[in-house]
Amino acid sequence: MESRVLLRATANVVGIPKLRRPIGAIHRQFSTASSSSFSVKPIGGIGEGANLISGRQLRPILLLDSSAINGGEKREILKPVKAAAAEGGDTAGDAKVGFLAKYPWLVTGFFFFMWYFLNVIFNILNKKIYNYFPYPYFVSVIHLFVGVVYCLISWSVGLPKRAPIDSNLLKVLIPVAVCHALGHVTSNVSFAAVAVSFTHTIKALEPFFNAAASQFIMGQSIPITLWLSLAPVVLGVAMASLTELSFNWLGFISAMISNISFTYRSIFSKKAMTDMDSTNVYAYISIIALFVCIPPAIIVEGPKLLNHGFADAIAKVGMTKFISDLFWVGMFYHLYNQLATNTLERVAPLTHAVGNVLKRVFVIGFSIVIFGNKISTQTGIGTGIAIAGVAMYSIIKAKIEEEKRQGKKA
């Protein structure tokens, strides 16, 4: 900006011949020049925007009239002007590209890493809590409560700015939040009842329920290729369930209810499409889901917690560790869900779908290593087949969605 203003300031001085006199002559001639030999010329008007730098007006300066100074003197005067213009061009004209802007794949890779890392840590810490505090309804409330407090603090400092909500948007978000709450609680009931790896194997069936709901409830036509890709998922889950050493019906049925709940959440989410950003939408859903989860937690687990639940947990690990575990598991739960949303915004649906499958592989693998869960050969093979089927389904579905978008653009 400064270079453009300075160059414009010199526009009134024209016809620069070769240098004939030394610069000292300028001062002698200027001191003897009559008052008519020079005039005051402001550099452009405010309306033209020529005198504004960073919102401040430049003070008018005295420019010697062409009759008062010969060509050589003009050239000497213009030297510092040109030098300043060149210096300004070097600093303001050539904006350096930031490191992160130059290598966006590093940022995306960091998002994927943090998404996986937080998800694995959440699942491990969550299961450790259930080993000494088997109250999934209460823990589910803590997950949402910590996330809601985090959102409220973020809103208070304007990161992000809270988006206003009206009664119409609230009506469409309530069904989404109810399904989110039900799916979250039943997932935790399953995590508490069986091995983490088995729960995630059962939850691999979620795409099957999504396809079934789209076909038979929403009336959407599902290509045969998608149905065929789901066959290995069903087969793999069946194989893993038959020989799972930690199998029990509470864990199995709870994971299946979670799949159905999250399927309906997806259906209601499509009906609740809004211009609000995903961070604010997730915050409002978390707040509503928290109020949905509190009553059943009080009814189902309240008396047990007051009688001996809290006391037993504190006796086993101590008050400080008990409270810190609940706080951090809630933070990890909220942050990994937020990172999943942020990652989806940075990559194509196909990349995110593959990443989601790999995330489940990471969680299953790490849970087996950390907790030393013994699995049979058939369970391992069944889990592998189910994950491969989910990968096939995710890739095919993402390609179909991309073709639809390209068709709409054309």
Swiss-Prot record:
GO cellular component: chloroplast membrane
Disruption phenotype: No visible phenotype under normal growth condition, but strong reduction of triose phosphate export from the chloroplast and reduced photosynthetic acclimation.
Keywords, sorted A to Z: Acetylation, Chloroplast, Membrane, Plastid, Sugar transport, Transit peptide, Transmembrane, Transmembrane helix, Transport
Topology class, membrane: Multi-pass membrane protein
One Pfam family this sequence matches: TPT
TM stretches of this protein: 105-125, 138-158, 172-192, 222-242, 244-264, 281-301, 313-333, 361-381
Location relative to the cell: Plastid, Chloroplast membrane
Summary of the tissues where the protein is detected: Expressed in shoots, leaves and flowers.
Residues carrying N-acetylalanine: 83
Swiss-Prot/TrEMBL induction comment: Expressed with a circadian rhythm showing an increase during the day and a decrease at night under long day conditions.
Transit peptide is among the record's keywords: yes
Transit peptide region: 1-82
GO function terms (MF aspect): phosphoglycerate transmembrane transporter activity; triose-phosphate transmembrane transporter activity
Protein's UniProt keywords contain Isomerase: no
GO BP terms, alphabetized: phosphoglycerate transmembrane transport; photosynthetic acclimation; triose phosphate transmembrane transport
Summary of the function given for this chain in its UniProt record: Triose phosphate/phosphate translocator that transports inorganic phosphate, 3-phosphoglycerate (3-PGA) and triose phosphate. Functions in the export of photoassimilates from chloroplasts during the day. In the light, triose phosphates are exported from the chloroplast stroma in counter exchange with inorganic phosphate (Pi), generated during sucrose biosynthesis in the cytosol. Involved in photosynthetic acclimation, a light response resulting in increased tolerance to high-intensity light.
NCBIfam families cross-referenced by the UniProt entry: tpt
Annotated family: Belongs to the TPT transporter family. TPT (TC 2.A.7.9) subfamily.
Record PANTHER family: SOLUTE CARRIER FAMILY 35 (PTHR11132)
Protein known as: Triose phosphate/phosphate translocator TPT, chloroplastic
Protein's gene: TPT
